[in-house]
Structures are given as structure tokens and as C-alpha cells.
A protein has these predicted regions:
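Short edge-strand/loop segments of extracellular domains
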Residues: 111, 157-164, 222-228
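Generic beta-strand structural signal
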Residues: 98-105, 115-117, 134-142, 152, ...
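Short, conserved beta-strand element in jelly-roll/cupin
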Residues: 129-149, 190-193, 198, 221-225
Length: 279
């Protein structure tokens, strides 16, 4: 496994990370994977991007010069290292329960010229979250590059995963009159290659203006509690031989179609409110 040297001792107790996630809606871990591993992951993402952008439904706009691409697990050379990593599995099980599901693999890629996104969450909040303060899904993120200030860093407003949101546009986009609150709470994230973050996709966030000529691909692994329902937004596939070779712990959690031959993914999760971006 491509675990950064010296990291193993840090994954024994994740209680503090779970508490941080519950409080802030996001938590990060430094140096989880080697830079060499992330370099291969970046190549996988960019290869997939240039293939996807050439076909309808392959790359979905998340604003000007910003796209989201979903992947089949087999397109990610380090997929098994990712979904069996003890910190990732430990966080998923601690927050979502032992029967958590892997429902999404994809990546977001802003290029030079990408604009600020509106403040948003990735889907409407369920009653379990806005009433009972229970997180029912997680997104694990890994950057493909060392993020610098000109690369449109991710901004997140800690603690906003509990905001109700039922009165918002699409239940995902706060009224612009409330944006100053999120800007006041916002923290800019500057992860390096090898770092992993774990967040609730309900925590209010946005991508920011990207001036660098270097693209900033970020892998997303989406994980659900049973019955959270986000698998319906995605269409992962694996071949029969790949599925049979998976360890049982992954096979029983991976929500996907098992097929004779992979076909390109036509994406289902188009977030209309992000297409135009903001200045």
C-alpha cells in the first residue's frame, strides 16, 4: 500500500478526527499517500479528462473553465489503495456505520480562467442531518497537485453542514444576501500531494478564481450510509473479472454495475446552479 512513511502510527485513533468532522464538517490528514502515488493518480485523472471532454455527458460543467468527470474504478490505478486505506475506511465506518457504501469516484478540475463559484452544497440536506445532526454521506478528496494561492483554492465554511437549506434555490444554494456570513466563516484550503480530506458535501463551500496555468484536479470518493440514496446519481461499472478479484470488504460496499465490457459514463449529477459561476 502506498502509505506515506511514518503515517501508520497515526491511524490507530480517529476519534479526534471524527469530532472535528462533526464540528466543522471537514477534516484533513497530511501526508497519507506518497507523492509518487499521487503523481500516477494525477495522470489517470488528466487522461480521463481529455477523453471525457470530447463526448457529450462525459465532462459536466461546474462553472467557466471548471469540469467534473466521473470515473470507473478500473480507470484509477490506485483505487484499491484508496478504498482500503485505514484512515478512509476508519472515518467512513465511524461516521456512516459498518455497512457504508462506495457510490462515486470522480474528479473536479478547474483550469486557468475558472471563476468563483456561488456558495453551495452538493445536494439537499436530508432530515437526518438538518434535524438530528447526523452525517449520512462523506466525500474524500485528494489533490493531484500542491495547491498554491493562484490555483483557485477550495473555500469551506466550517459548521454549516447543519444549516437547514430547505428554503434555498434547489435546496443547495443560499440566497446571495447570506453570502457574507459564509465569507466570514470561510477557510481556504491549501492541501499538498498526498493529503486527504474528509468532508460532508453539505458543508457550504465554493471553488475560487483560478489564475494559474496549471490545472488543479481533485479526486472525489463519495461514500454513503445505507439508504442515503446518492448511488442513484451515479453509474459506476466494473468488469466481471475485476469485480471477482476485489476483496470482499470492497466488493460488498461498491455500488456498481458488473458488466462484460466498460462503456463511457454519461453523468447524471448536473448541478445547474454552478454552470455560470460568479465574478
Amino acid at each position: 500500500m502506498a502509505i506515506h512513511a511514518g503515517f501508520a502510527a497515526e491511524i490507530e485513533n480517529i476519534t479526534e478526527d471524527v469530532l472535528t468532522l462533526q464540528r466543522d464538517g471537514v477534516v484533513g490528514k497530511k501526508g497519507v499517500f506518497s507523492r509518487e502515488f499521487i503523481g500516477r493518480l494525477r495522470e489517470d485523472m488528466m487522461t480521463a479528462f481529455w477523453e471525457a471532454i470530447q463526448r457529450p455527458g462525459g465532462a459536466v460543467s461546474r462553472g467557466p473553465r471548471r469540469w467534473y468527470v466521473e470515473l470507473h474504478p478500473q480507470a484509477v490505478s490506485g483505487f484499491m489503495d484508496l478504498v482500503t486505506h485505514p484512515w478512509i475506511t476508519g472515518m467512513a465506518e465511524a461516521v456512516l456505520g459498518s455497512e457504508y457504501q462506495i457510490v462515486e469516484v470522480g474528479f473536479d478540475t478547474p483550469f486557468q480562467g475558472a471563476k468563483n463559484q456561488p456558495w453551495h452544497r452538493d445536494f439537499p440536506s436530508p432530515k437526518d442531518t438538518y434535524e438530528d445532526h447526523r452525517i449520512t454521506s462523506l466525500a474524500f478528496n485528494l489533490t493531484g497537485v500542491d495547491v498554491t494561492p493562484d490555483m483557485g483554492p477550495f473555500e469551506v465554511a466550517p459548521g454549516t453542514q447543519w444549516d437547514d437549506g430547505r428554503s434555498w434555490k434547489h435546496e443547495m444554494f443560499p440566497d446571495p444576501a447570506a453570502w457574507s456570513r459564509y465569507a466570514g466563516l470561510a477557510v481556504r484550503k491549501f492541501p499538498a500531494m498526498g493529503d486527504v480530506s474528509c468532508r460532508s458535501a453539505l458543508t457550504i463551500h465554493r471553488g475560487t478564481t483560478h489564475d494559474s496555468p496549471i490545472a488543479r484536479p481533485v479526486l472525489v470518493i463519495g461514500v454513503d450510509a445505507p439508504a442515503a440514496g446518492h448511488a442513484a446519481l451515479h453509474d459506476m461499472m466494473v468488469t466481471k473479472d475485476y469485480h471477482a478479484a476485489l476483496p470482499q470488504s470492497v466488493r460488498e460496499r461498491l455500488v456498481c454495475r458488473v458488466v462484460d465490457q466498460l462503456v463511457p459514463i454519461t453523468q447524471k449529477h448536473d448541478i445547474e446552479g454552478l454552470v455560470m459561476g460568479v465574478a
